């Protein structure tokens, strides 16, 4: 069974419409690209389509000096929001982005300020994909007391999703696994909800899951010219599974667009660091 995300996207669109009324101009999003792979190009194409649809001025910049470009657009009054495409070029790390990006323009929620503030629920923005994961899970089931296993410990998905799912009011029990985790299949089979965010095409098959489990597929991989997830589609025969494409990625892009309008609206002085 495939999990539908249309209702979630409609709710985000409604929020965007409300924010647009408060922003009397076309907000500008700068997407910095270093060394895009096929999955990155696919996501940027999605950005282009959605930016046009929602009335966002999207500028995609091929960056040869990410640090200097971050400084440039941090200080540019015409730029409301900044996105950094992955993968990063050798020599750059996630910490470089976290240190240099302006938290007010950090619509991905990856700055040191926003990541640190997540522990106190005071962030300006949270990572878009992690928020998409949480929204889909909450739209599908009550997470209180649920056992959730996350495959992957990235700063954009695994770690922030774990923090948000454990917050008071959600109260899930979360296990974050990684490449060094032993007895991985035994751990995943004990979960009520499995989140796959490892970037390996069709890695999760029926041997990782149990019947009736909710499986959130975060993966965007290109195989033979087609986009596939981290989860084999056959898993949908015994589990509730988000589709790829059309699942987490679609919600993530909608959240990013909403965050651009939030950043533009916050320029008026509503934001408190």
Swiss-Prot record:
InterPro entries on file: Aminoacid_DH-like_N_sf (IPR046346), NAD(P)-bd_dom_sf (IPR036291), THF_DH/CycHdrlase (IPR000672), THF_DH/CycHdrlase_cat_dom (IPR020630), THF_DH/CycHdrlase_NAD-bd_dom (IPR020631)
Binding site for NADP(+): 152-154, 179, 220
GO BP: L-histidine biosynthetic process; methionine biosynthetic process; purine nucleotide biosynthetic process; tetrahydrofolate interconversion
Pfam families hit by this protein: THF_DHG_CYH (PF00763), THF_DHG_CYH_C (PF02882)
E.C. numbers: 1.5.1.5, 3.5.4.9
Keyword Hydrolase: yes
Listed PANTHER family: C-1-TETRAHYDROFOLATE SYNTHASE, CYTOPLASMIC (PTHR48099:SF5), C-1-TETRAHYDROFOLATE SYNTHASE, CYTOPLASMIC-RELATED (PTHR48099)
Family note: Belongs to the tetrahydrofolate dehydrogenase/cyclohydrolase family.
HAMAP family noted in UniProt: THF_DHG_CYH
Protein name: Bifunctional protein FolD
Organism expressing this protein natively: Petrotoga mobilis (strain DSM 10674 / SJ95)
Gene: folD
């Amino acid at each position: 069974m495939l999990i539908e995300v249309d209702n979630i996207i409609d709710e985000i669109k409604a929020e965007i419409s409300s924010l647009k009324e408060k922003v009397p101009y076309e907000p500008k999003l700068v997407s910095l690209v270093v060394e895009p792979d096929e999955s990155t190009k696919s996501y940027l194409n999605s950005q282009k389509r959605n930016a046009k649809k929602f009335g966002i001025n999207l500028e995609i910049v091929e960056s040869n000096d990410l640090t200097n470009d971050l400084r440039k657009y941090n200080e540019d009054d015409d730029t409301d929001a900044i996105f950094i495409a992955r993968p990063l070029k050798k020599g750059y790390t996630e910490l470089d982005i976290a240190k240099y990006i302006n938290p007010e323009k950090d619509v991905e929620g990856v700055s040191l300020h926003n990541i640190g503030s997540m522990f106190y629920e005071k962030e300006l923005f949270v990572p878009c994909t992690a928020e998409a994961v949480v929204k889909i899970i909450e739209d599908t089931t009550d997470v209180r007391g649920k056992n959730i296993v996350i495959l992957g410990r990235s700063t954009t998905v695994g770690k922030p999703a774990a923090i948000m799912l454990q917050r008071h009011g959600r109260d899930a029990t979360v296990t974050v696994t990684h490449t060094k985790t032993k007895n991985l299949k035994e751990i995943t089979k004990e979960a009520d909800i499995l989140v796959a965010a490892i970037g390996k095409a069709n890695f999760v098959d029926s041997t990782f899951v149990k019947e009736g489990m909710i499986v959130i597929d975060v993966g965007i991989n290109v195989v033979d010219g087609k986009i596939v997830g981290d989860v084999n589609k056959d898993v949908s025969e015994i589990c509730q599974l988000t589709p790829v494409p059309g699942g987490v990625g679609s919600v993530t892009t909608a959240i990013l667009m909403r965050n651009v309008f939030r950043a533009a609206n916050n320029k008026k002085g509503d934001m408190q660091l």
